[in-house]
């Protein structure tokens, strides 16, 4: 199997499954394979509770991108970040000119109420942000979501 060819088949890979089935291990392996093939990789962690950073000997992930593996010698870098529905909603509001509303939601504690107002809204917020990252070219082959 040609790793570069495999990784170039899609711009986005979603790794999903029940707890304890190896999602973190598969994600790390895919990211390392893509980086080894020279493809810059962004891992987006959505559950916020995996040991992904430790597989790269890195600190805890945050909403801001962190370089997990710097690349070099023909390999590209592996970056990672967490993504929460609350952060995705706040960023969406700010990006659409609603910074004052986003600040009020945070101050009042109503952010969680808004982010969970309808069934499935948390998933929509996260997937919408992942789609935005992929379209912006930030999530290069493969942007992996746990």
Question: Which residues does each PLM region occupy?
Answer:
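Flexible phosphate-sensing "switch/lid" loops adjacent to ATP/NTP-binding sites
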Residues: 1-14, 21, 26-146
């Amino acid at each position: 199997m040609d790793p570069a060819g495999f990784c170039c088949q899609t711009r986005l890979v979603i790794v999903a499954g029940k707890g304890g089935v190896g999602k973190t291990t598969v994600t790390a392996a895919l990211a390392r394979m893509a980086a080894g093939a020279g493809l810059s990789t962004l891992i987006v962690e959505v559950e916020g509770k995996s040991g992904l950073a430790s597989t790269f000997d890195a600190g805890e992930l945050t909403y801001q991108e962190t370089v997990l593996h710097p690349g070099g010698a023909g390999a590209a870098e592996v970056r990672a970040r967490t993504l929460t529905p609350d952060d995705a909603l706040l960023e969406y509001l700010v990006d659409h000119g609603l910074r004052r509303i986003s600040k009020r939601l945070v101050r009042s504690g109503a952010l969680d109420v808004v982010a969970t107002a309808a069934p499935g809204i948390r998933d929509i917020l996260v997937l919408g942000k992942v789609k935005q990252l992929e379209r912006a070219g930030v999530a290069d082959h493969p942007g992996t979501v746990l």
